[in-house]
């Protein structure tokens, strides 16, 4: 939200592991990846085991002294805490350490601000940042760390921001109003899409699982992809043809991550819910990631929150070229490598097989006088066999329940 000059940020990561905490190592590794994605140089990390977080400084006083020495010795410019800090903890840590301190939530918000491309995406990120910022305003101003620039202070195209409570509340109201207009337009487009006979596929998965690679492979078009977190923010929908003429739409949206800030979930709800209005969900999982089971649980949990559990699902374990003797946790599944030469044909075959399970089988006698209508039928159905007879042909295939009326056009 505040424009600053670019310079290298040397960061120190801090994590506190409470008793019985799951996935602490994963969380710390992700924090390092997030920091690198934001452009920081991760110098080191400090970990501490405690029964509870210190209410004043998050870590214990002894550990805080060690951290202060490290900050001075290694010329640390930013400390990133792997947890949501209270405003009080944030201010106290900065006073003791003498450098900018941000938490995991602020870091993720910062990356989203970097990645936002569309008008809607920028509005959603800006709204999430303001909601995060509001309880952290001190009096009529903002904590000093926000004036320091760099990681944690970036915004979607905004150079200056008048930071006081009334201003922030007014901006939140204004952005929410703008988003309602955008969401109304999105709902209109979605309604037309739902009325369409076209089969709809949604890609979901943990961030950096390879969804954009699969999207590019199937569409033969280029969408930004990189080995980094949150490379894609905006929902993207493209049309493709499978098995000849069957037309389907493919939608890719923002990847998930554990502890996704509630401000982002709220702001991006309409974008996340794009995957809710599909006929088939393709859950993409990075099989090479040692924490893929935890990733799966996170995605399934968010799917549950968005009421997406009952949508037919195809599970794809991606990056098969990087693993050996892989054991899946979800059944049924397919193990693929989206970047391999034959991946396009493999993906198309997998999708067609799954669609056949969803569609209903049919057998249709088509007289030669109506054969010209077969081309239109192919766009909404999978034609399995065509047996030519003296007076026409017999077609067997699969079609969606909502499109079975299309078969009536061939009846005498």
What are these model-derived regions, one by one?
Residues 107-125:
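Short alpha-helix plus adjacent loop in nuclease-associated cores
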Residues 28-34, 68-71, 85-95, 245-246, ...:
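Conserved C-terminal guanine-recognition region of P-loop GTPase G domains, centered on the G4
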Residues 1-13, 138-209, 215, 301-412:
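C-terminal-of-GTPase-core extension/linker across diverse P-loop GTPases
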Residues 17-21, 50-52, 84-87, 106-109, ...:
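Conserved nucleotide-binding/hydrolysis micro-motifs of P-loop NTPases
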Residues 18-22, 54-57, 115-119, 160, ...:
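Flexible beta-alpha connector loops of hexameric P-loop NTPases
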Residues 2-3, 26-29, 52-68, 234, ...:
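Switch II of P-loop NTPase G domains
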